[in-house]
C-alpha cells in the first residue's frame, strides 16, 4: 500500500495504473488484483488505512464541541475537521502528507470514492456539516453547505500544500503555520456565510 499511496499522491489516482503499483512495489503482475480486486479496492484501502483514525479523532473533537452546548463558531467547526489532519502530519510526516494530498485531490475532483469512509447518514462528516450550519443560523442551509464545501476543500488543499511546514521538527512553528491556515479558512467561511 505504501507504493500505491506514494504514486496516488504524486501522480493523482487517475494517473496511476495497477501495473505501475505492482512494479513500484516489486510485486507480481496480478498482486493488486489478488489482494484488492482492482484499483478502486486498493484506493479504498489506502484511504481507510489512515482515514479511520482521522475520522475517529474528528468524532471525538465533535463530541466535545457538541457537549459544550453553545452555538459553534466557524473556527471551532473548522478545527474539528483540521486538527486530526495536523495530528496525522505530526505523527506520520511522509505518509500523512501523502494521504492528505490524495484526499484533497479526490475531494477537489468531487470523486465519490473519498466519501466511502466517514460519510453518509449520521456520519461524522454529516455531523460536522450540521455544526457548520448551526454556526450560521440566519443563512439558508443550502447556501452554508455550498460555501462549507468550498471552504473545506480549500482547507484540505492548504494543509496538503503546507505539509512540509506543518510536519517540521519545531512544534511551535508548525502549530503557528497551522493556526494561520485554520484562521484563514474560518474567517473566509464566516465572511461568505454572513454575506
Model-based region annotation:
Residues 81, 85, 100-107, 151-155, ...:
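Short alpha-helical scaffolding segments that buttress acidic/His motifs in well-ordered protein cores
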